[in-house]
From Swiss-Prot:
Expressed in young panicles. Specifically expressed in pollen mother cells and young microspores. Pfam families: LTP_2. GO terms for biological process: pollen exine formation. This is Non-specific lipid-transfer protein EPAD1.
């Protein structure tokens, strides 16, 4: 029983001694991170990198700011801040280029691809652009046909003229006196009609022609005899 109590006491003492040590270690790491973050100057480091660095060209002047941004500036977060500066964006350098240069310069932290992925972070979801629906075309209703207004009372059609009978006309004119011709009768000449001339017979006309020829011959003969 006494041994078990002693074991429990020793465990409690060891736990009590380990908690302050862990807390102290955490505090030291936090202080180091704060110091490293304070020592990271992304604008100055980005200016130096843009002046002296080019992709796949790890010169001595280029390696100094690149290695300092990772080893002395707080690790990958500082390098990501340097890569986000406008100087490097204009120069065409990104975090992948810087980590490649860091590995070529002999940096203390390996795994450039993993560090570059940490800089880039998860890709944002692609925004889906939805086009607005087309406007609904409203159909215009044709205007209703209005009935023509009724004609006024003054413009009513007059009744057709009535046809008068001849009997009514005769009644109005009155009876004609005796001996007078009717108004519409044609004038007929009074007296006997002249007799047509008698037609000439065909025999007399046929005799007159030879008689005239004979008379002409006799006259010519007499004239010739008188001359001799």
């Amino acid at each position: 029983m006494e041994r078990s109590h002693l074991a429990v006491l020793l465990g409690l003492l060891a736990f009590a001694a380990g908690v302050p040590a862990a807390a102290a270690a955490t505090a030291v790491e936090g202080a180091q991170a704060a110091t490293a973050e304070a020592s990271c100057e992304p604008s100055i480091l980005a200016t130096q990198v843009s002046l002296f660095c080019a992709p796949d060209m790890p010169t001595a002047q280029c390696c100094e700011p690149v290695v300092a941004s990772v080893d002395l500036g707080g690790g990958v977060p500082c390098l990501c801040r340097v890569a986000a500066e406008p100087q490097l964006i204009i120069s065409g350098l990104n975090a992948t280029h810087l980590l490649t240069l860091y590995a070529a310069c002999g940096g203390l932290r390996p795994g450039g691809a993993r560090l570059a992925a940490a800089c880039e972070g998860p890709a944002p979801p692609a925004s889906i652009v939805t086009a607005p629906p087309p406007p609904v075309a409203f159909r215009r209703k044709p205007p209703a046909r209005e009935a023509p207004p009724p004609p006024p009372a003054a413009e009513k059609l007059s009744p057709p003229p009535q046809q008068h009978d001849d009997s009514d006309h005769n009644k109005r004119v009155g009876p004609l006196p005796r001996g007078s011709p009717p108004p519409y009768a044609q004038s007929v000449p009074v007296g006997p009609a002249a007799a047509p001339p008698p037609p000439r017979s065909g025999a007399s006309s046929s005799l007159q022609a030879p008689l005239a020829a004979t008379t002409t011959i006799v006259a010519i003969t007499l004239i010739a005899a008188a001359q001799y």
